[in-house]
């Protein structure tokens, strides 16, 4: 008699680690152990991802349009389609049952002179990151967004699980990329250059690195980090996105305490797509979260184009403004005349490296 030995799959091993993390109470004594478990899980997720990519398959394809893209992420039947319709009038199909949206439906929110693409995505379910319910295809769309709008309903359930599904595919919300770099070596082990203030033990840093098959390297850590930051760095395919939460169906009975608990995941907008309550406030919060910068162009005659501002992002300079208009303007640039609420001087001469802000009015003066 022969017995077939079934080896655990990568997904099986990931689930085992997830269960162990859930069972382990987090404290100072277990912090290092949990960090290593997370590192092992992240490495296995990378392996699973590479296997799935090599297998091919069709996915969703959505061209980016407008000045920024917002992806709506949430469980089925929380009212994402209704919310998109309330903001954009896109005609996304609505129903009182799960999985009404089976494809990505884009709409355009026109707000304060900006055109913001809103993506109504199919609802994700538990284990979406492993492929359940076409989850990996949905989550791949999210990676290219400028803002993630997490949508829940009056029951306010499962937000932590949704955020975890996003993290599993390398989407990290409301965190900044840490200043870490690495130079690989052939010998010498792992040498760490870090600030004195860093409390993460060197042994733990080295153990996490070794989980990602790094045994010889110079690792430069230039600010305070935790094990999650290190794992994200070694993983290498992580995107960092801002996010906020929309609690839909707020016109129905709900528990305010549960909704307040969502504050730990980001800013909250309480809305009702069916009655319109809070929809305008949600639009403003989306606009603010995107950190868009509208620059109004003024020609030599003094006419200002308030209808079609140039929409850029925070940190934009006069150089970026010129580059977005035309390369030729950048070459022939002499100076710019800026009118801004920030300055007491109404028409101030500025150069290419001057930072512009939302609402600034600018005239570009060329050499010829």
Question: Where are the regions a protein language model picked out?
Answer:
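Conserved G1/Walker A P-loop phosphate-binding module
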Residues: 2-186, 192-200
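C-terminal-of-GTPase-core extension/linker across diverse P-loop GTPases
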Residues: 23, 29-68, 73, 78, ...
């Amino acid at each position: 008699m022969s017995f077939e030995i079934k080896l655990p799959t990568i997904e099986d091993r990931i689930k085992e680690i997830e269960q162990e993390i859930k069972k382990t109470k987090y404290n100072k004594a277990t912090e290092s152990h949990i960090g290593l478990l997370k590192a092992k899980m992240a490495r296995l997720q990378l392996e699973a991802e590479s296997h799935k990519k090599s297998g091919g398959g069709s996915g969703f394809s959505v061209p980016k349009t407008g000045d920024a893209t917002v992806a709506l992420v949430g469980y089925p039947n929380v009212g994402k389609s209704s919310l998109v319709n309330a903001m954009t009038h896109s005609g996304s199909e609505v129903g009182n049952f799960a999985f009404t949206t089976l494809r990505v439906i884009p709409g355009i929110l026109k707000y304060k002179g900006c055109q913001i693409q809103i993506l109504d995505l199919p609802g994700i379910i538990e284990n979406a990151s492993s492929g359940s319910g076409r989850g990996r295809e949905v989550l791949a769309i999210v990676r290219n967004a400028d803002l993630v709008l997490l949508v829940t309903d009056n029951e306010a359930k499962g937000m932590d699980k949704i955020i975890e599904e996003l993290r599993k595919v390398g989407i990290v919300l409301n965190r900044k990329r840490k200043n870490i770099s690495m130079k690989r070596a052939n010998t010498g082990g792992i040498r760490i250059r870090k600030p004195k203030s860093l409390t993460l033990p060197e042994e733990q840093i080295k153990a996490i690195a070794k989980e990602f098959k790094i045994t010889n390297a110079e690792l430069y850590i230039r600010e305070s980090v935790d094990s999650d930051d290190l794992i994200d760095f070694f993983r290498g395919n992580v995107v960092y996105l801002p996010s906020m939460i929309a609690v839909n169906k707020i016109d129905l009975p709900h528990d305010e305490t549960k909704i307040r608990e969502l504050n730990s995941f980001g800013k909250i907008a309480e809305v009702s797509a069916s009655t319109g309550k809070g929809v305008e406030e949600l639009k403003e919060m989306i606009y603010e979260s995107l950190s868009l910068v509208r620059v109004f162009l003024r020609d030599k005659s003094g006419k200002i184009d308030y209808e079609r501002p140039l929409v850029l992002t925070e940190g934009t300079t006069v150089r970026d403004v010129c580059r977005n208009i035309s390369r030729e303007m950048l070459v022939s640039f002499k100076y710019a005349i800026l009118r801004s609420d920030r300055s007491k001087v109404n028409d101030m001469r500025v150069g290419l490296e001057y930072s512009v802000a939302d609402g600034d009015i600018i005239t570009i003066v060329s050499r010829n």
